[in-house]
């Protein structure tokens, strides 16, 4: 199968903050902490093949970031402790940058590798996500397990409560075609 790609198929999208979110879940010996942030910004740039798949060349680009102090669990005390752990005054944003993208096992699924920058440190993670698009927008959804120790962060221990260093992160990006 041969698919032709031309520059006309390259599309830039801007992340729509109101429709996009990052949800997180961390476990402790007492309970599960869940939270969400919606104030995401960023851009996605892809070249579409004629069959609606993302072309490997030129490589897709994606940059997304979010403000640490918009990460909310519904518990103000926990939120402030989380921001303090991340050192939100020195490192007010978390960023994600796509490095590689390859077609996955099923239509609309892709394997990705990218860098997450948290608390001033960048680490490479691999994952898989789904992509849906139409003429006006693109929607990307995926899940990733992040270990906060990779970023030099120590899981908090509050007397008898221990927090697991693994955090499950679910991402939903909705981005509108840029003019």
Walk through the language-model features, giving the residues of each.
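Low-complexity, acidic/polar, glycine-enriched regions of mature
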Residues: 1-179
